[in-house]
Swiss-Prot record:
Cofactor section: Zn(2+)
Originating organism: Francisella philomiragia subsp. philomiragia (strain ATCC 25017 / CCUG 19701 / FSC 153 / O#319-036)
Family that this chain belongs to: Belongs to the DnaJ family.
Protein name, entry field: Chaperone protein DnaJ
Keywords (A to Z) from UniProt: Chaperone, Cytoplasm, DNA replication, Metal-binding, Repeat, Stress response, Zinc, Zinc-finger
GO terms of molecular function: ATP binding; heat shock protein binding; unfolded protein binding; zinc ion binding
Length: 374
C-alpha cells in the first residue's frame, strides 16, 4: 500500500514554512485527537497520520531527507513516536509549550556551553607550511571543589516552586503557557550551602592551554572550529566550541591574492638591457629566473606552482614577479661620462630605434597639442 504524502496529510504546500506546518498540525490534531473522538477508529488512524507527518516535517533534517528521497529517506528513523499510544488531550499543547508538571518528568534544563572565539596571528610562512600553536584561553569549567554541583556538600534539593521541573506552567482555558522558574532559574533545584569557590554556580573561570594545529594553506579570515573546547555546559549538556580566527601578517616581500603570490622584482639597468639570471626568493627556497634582454619595467614573470598551497588538495598557486628597472644613483664622474658617451652613441633617432614606447608617447603628446591649439 502506497504511503500518503506528508504534505497532503497536513494540507500544506511543499514550500510551507515551519510556522505554517505547526499551525496546520495544531488545527488537525485538535480535530482528530482520540480524547475528542472516543471509539472512533478512523479518527485514531487519522491522528496517527497527522502526528507522523508533523514529526517529519517539523524537523529540518528529516524534512530534507523526505523531500529528497521520499518515505525511504525517513522510514529508518522509526516513524512518529505517537503511533505506540496516546497521552491526554494536553499532549497537543506540550508540543508547542513544553511538557506540563503533571507528567512528573524532570524539567531541569540542560544548557549547552557558550562558544568562544580566539584570534591567532601567524606569518605568511606559517600559513604556507602549517604550524602548531599553543594558546591560553580563559573559559568556564566545572568547579572542582563541588564537582559542578554548586554546593559545598555536593548535593542539591528540589526547587519548591517548580517541583524540579525548571518551569512554571499556567493554564488559561484551552491554552497552557510556560515560563522559566524565577526561583531556580530553570535548574529545577536549589542549593542550601553554596560553594565558596563558584558561589553556587557550579562553574569557575580557568585558564586552559590548548594546542591548535593550523593546516597549510590557511588564509586571512579563515576559522578553525575546535569542538567541545568552549565553555562547560550545564546539567550534563555539551561544552561549547572554540573558534580560532586566523590573522595572517603582512609580508615584506609577497602579497597574497587567493592562492597566488605577487612581488616586485628590482633589476639593474644593465641586466634589463643585456639580460641574465637573477635569484628570486620564494616561500620554499630560491629559484633562478632568466631575464630576457631588453626587459622593460612592468613586465611580469610567472613562476608556476611557486605560490601558496591549497587548503584542500595538493594544488599550488603561482608566483608573479613584476619587474622594476632601477635607475643607477650616486654615479661618479667617470660613470656619468660613460653614460653620456652611451647616449651620444644612440644617435638622434634613438627613440624610434631604442625607445619605442617613449617615441609613441611623445608622438601622442604632439598630436594632442596640435588638436588643442588649432
Amino acid at each position: 500500500m502506497q504511503q500518503k504524502c506528508y504534505y497532503e496529510i497536513l494540507n500544506v504546500s511543499k514550500t510551507a514554512s515551519g510556522v505554517e506546518i505547526k499551525r496546520a498540525y495544531r488545527k488537525l490534531a485538535m480535530k482528530y485527537h482520540p480524547d475528542r473522538n472516543p471509539d472512533d477508529k478512523e479518527a485514531e488512524i487519522k491522528f496517527k497520520e497527522i502526528s507522523e507527518a508533523y514529526e517529519i516535517l517539523s524537523d529540518d533534517g528529516k524534512r530534507s531527507r523526505y523531500d529528497q528521497f521520499g518515505h525511504a529517506g525517513v522510514n529508518q528513523q522509526g516513524g512518529a513516536g505517537s503511533a505506540g499510544g496516546f497521552g491526554g488531550f494536553e499532549d497537543i499543547f506540550d508540543t508547542f509549550f513544553g511538557g506540563g508538571t503533571s507528567r512528573g518528568s524532570n524539567r531541569s534544563r540542560a544548557s549547552r556551553g557558550s562558544d568562544l572565539e580566539y584570534t591567532i596571528e601567524i606569518s605568511l610562512e606559517e600559513a604556507f607550511f602549517g604550524v602548531e600553536k599553543e594558546i591560553n584561553i580563559p573559559r568556564m569549567e566545572s568547579c572542582d571543589s563541588c564537582d559542578g554541583t554548586g554546593s559545598k556538600s555536593k548535593t542539591k534539593t528540589t526547587c519548591h516552586a517548580c517541583h524540579g521541573q525548571g518551569t512554571i506552567r499556567r493554564q488559561q482555558g484551552f491554552f497552557a503557557f510556560e515560563q522559566t522558574c524565577p526561583v531556580c532559574n530553570g535548574t529545577g533545584s536549589s542549593i542550601a550551602d553554596p560553594c565558596d569557590d563558584c558561589y553556587g554556580s557550579g562553574k569557575i573561570k580557568k585558564q586552559k592551554t590548548i594546542k591548535v594545529k593550523i593546516p597549510e594553506g590557511v588564509d586571512n579570515g579563515d576559522r578553525i572550529r575546535l569542538q567541545g573546547e568552549g565553555d562547560s555546559g550545564s546539567n550534563g549538556a555539551m561544552n561549547g566550541d572554540l573558534y580560532i580566527q586566523i590573522l595572517v601578517k603582512e609580508h615584506k616581500i609577497f602579497e597574497r591574492r587567493d592562492m597566488n603570490l605577487y612581488c616586485e622584482m628590482p633589476i639593474s639597468f644593465t641586466k634589463a638591457c643585456l639580460g641574465g639570471e637573477i635569484k628570486v626568493p620564494t616561500l620554499d627556497g630560491e629559484v633562478v629566473l632568466k631575464v630576457v634582454p631588453e626587459t622593460q619595467t612592468g613586465k611580469v614573470f610567472r613562476l608556476r606552482e611557486r605560490g601558496m598551497k591549497s587548503l584542500r588538495g595538493q594544488r599550488r598557486g603561482d608566483l608573479l614577479c613584476k619587474v622594476v628597472v632601477e635607475t643607477p644613483i650616486n654615479l661618479n664622474s667617470e660613470q656619468k661620462e660613460l653614460l653620456e658617451k652611451f647616449a651620444d652613441s644612440l644617435g638622434e633617432d634613438y627613440q624610434s630605434k631604442h625607445s619605442p614606447k617613449s617615441k609613441t608617447w611623445f608622438d601622442n603628446v604632439k598630436d594632442y597639442a596640435k588638436k588643442f591649439f588649432e
